[in-house]
Amino acid sequence: MIKKELGIIGIGKIGSALLRRFINSNTINHDNIIIYDINYDRLKAISNEFDVSIAKNIAELVKISNYILIAVLPQVINTVLEEVKEVLSEQQVLISIAAGITINHIKTFIPKSVGIIRIMTNSPALIGEAATAIAINKDVNEKDLSFAKNLFRSVGIVVELDEIHLDAVTGLSGSGPAYIFIIIEALADGGVKMGLSREISIKLAAQTVLGSAKLLLETKKHPGELKDMVATPAGTTITAIHELESAKLRATLIRAVEAATLKSRSLNSSSFK
């Protein structure tokens, strides 16, 4: 087969969402991509939708891809790496989005001087609004790093960090959308309790979160400053904030990020080796 720029192993929800954004943003041409998934029906459907090549197996994909994006669950990445290592060359680059799987863990399967890029993104990649963090090993050059950054800029913002921080990124922005959905749902429940319809309550709550986030990013003001702009003396907002503080909302969110971070670290434990 003709050499491909990008091979994607795993075309589940995130893998297919990334593929969609890569192509629709014109970051990479469809005929420069090859994909593989253990679910052949899904693989065929995605191939037909985006007009991309499919591989018969992992080995075939690796042999003809310059960059290999591994988009599988951490629980099965060892099995994938066992197959990848048999045909991987030192000129290729591995890109992994498996949560909690460190570069050193991958290196135990890939002893060669292969460039490894670890990615932590999140579910808003589905609509091109992801928050993505990238970490690399010493074998990744500027060209390879630029390729990965350009890919993931097509799904949102990208930051480069030392790998030691990626588990915290997992706890904050990786799991963060779920926290925000709970907050939106709870705000909507409050609206319903006070007499608004469910539909209107969800719409208002979601737009409030979206608008507040945009205001923060565009003004670059500290969130506390923006909060104080809304909380006027003896007003409704400061009264509500008092309730949130009494219920220890801040501490609960901090503990949630901490718990998810520790769980991410544990995913690379001996149970996966």
Show where each model-derived region lies.
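Rossmann-like NAD(P)(H) cofactor-binding subdomain of soluble oxidoreductases
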Residues: L18, Y40, F50, I58-I134, ...
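NAD(P)-dependent Rossmann-like dehydrogenase/reductase catalytic/cofactor-binding core
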Residues: I2, A206-K273
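Short pre-catalytic strand/loop immediately N-terminal to key active-site residues, enriched for Gly-Thr
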Residues: I117, L166-G171, P223-D228
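Small-residue helix-packing motif on alpha-helices
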Residues: I33, L43, L61, I77, ...
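NAD(P)+-binding Rossmann beta1-loop-alpha1 motif at the extreme N-terminus of oxidoreductases
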Residues: M1-E49, S53-K56, E60, E129-A130, ...
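Internal alpha-helical scaffold of NAD(P)-dependent oxidoreductase catalytic cores
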Residues: H105, F109-G115, A131-A168, F181-E218
